[in-house]
Regions:
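Membrane-embedded beta-barrel scaffold of Gram-negative outer-membrane proteins
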Residues: 2, 8-10, 43-95, 101
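Outer-membrane beta-barrel proteins
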Residues: 40-44, 139
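Residue-level signature of outer-membrane beta-barrel architecture
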Residues: 1-3, 15, 44, 56-58, ...
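Signature of Gram-negative outer-membrane beta-barrel scaffolds
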Residues: 1-7, 19, 30
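Short, intrinsically disordered, charge-balanced linker/junction segments flanking boundaries
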Residues: 1, 5, 164, 179-185
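Gram-negative outer-membrane beta-barrel transporters
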Residues: 66-77, 93-178
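Exposed loop/turn and edge beta-strand positions of beta-sandwich/beta-sheet ligand-binding modules
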Residues: 36-38, 48, 63, 103, ...
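Outer-membrane beta-barrel translocator domains and adjoining extracellular loop/strand segments
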Residues: 22-30, 35-37, 79-88, 126-138, ...
Length: 185
């Protein structure tokens, strides 16, 4: 939907299916010395996806400032869970028994300060949670937030381009690396 030439709204919704290839997609876990347990009869993943975005173009000093904001929500009906928390000596793959979802909000701005030089900034906030053996927790190894700032310069003939990128990664949950014996550390 375009109410005028400077603002564009988009909505999307759909259902997706995906076959999970547990070893190919999680091969980094093979170097962790954990025993790999793969449940029999893993289901094809199934999820509903919803999204909304707005793009706006603001004239500033004869140039165009582009601002984009988007929000996406994914609700998993079926998912292969990668469980690194139940046992610190193994990684288990099994079908979701509970709820799993992801909320992602991102905003981005880009402005060409002078011919060939563009500055772009972006920020993303993520809330991804999954049920592990009856307990809903934040997905491990997933950053809660991420910031990005890129300065880009392209030479007048367009042959060379130079970029400097600064990145900020927010903390995320780490799997528990030890077992609790009788609630003691």
């Amino acid at each position: 939907y375009n109410p005028n030439e400077y603002v564009h709204f988009r909505l999307s919704a759909g259902k997706g299916y995906r076959t999970n290839h547990v070893l190919a997609e999680n091969n980094y876990l093979l170097s962790s010395s954990r025993k790999v347990e793969i449940a029999k009869g893993l289901d094809m993943e199934e999820a509903w996806n919803y999204g909304a975005s707005v793009s706006t173009y603001v004239p500033v000093f004869g140039k165009t400032l582009n601002i984009n904001a988007e929000y996406y929500y994914t609700d998993f009906l079926k998912q292969v869970v990668v469980d690194m928390d139940s046992n610190p000596h193994e990684v288990a793959f099994y079908n979701l028994d509970g709820r799993s979802y992801s909320h992602v909000f991102q905003v981005e701005a880009s402005y060409p300060f002078f011919k060939g030089f563009t500055l772009t900034g972006a920020y993303r906030l993520t809330d991804a949670q999954t049920t592990y053996k009856g307990q809903r927790m934040e997905k491990p190894l997933t950053s809660k937030y991420k910031g990005l700032l890129t300065a880009s310069y392209q030479t007048p003939l367009g042959i060379w381009q130079f970029d400097a990128t600064f990145q900020l990664n927010g903390g995320g949950r780490m799997p528990v690396p030890y077992e609790l014996a009788n609630g003691q550390l």
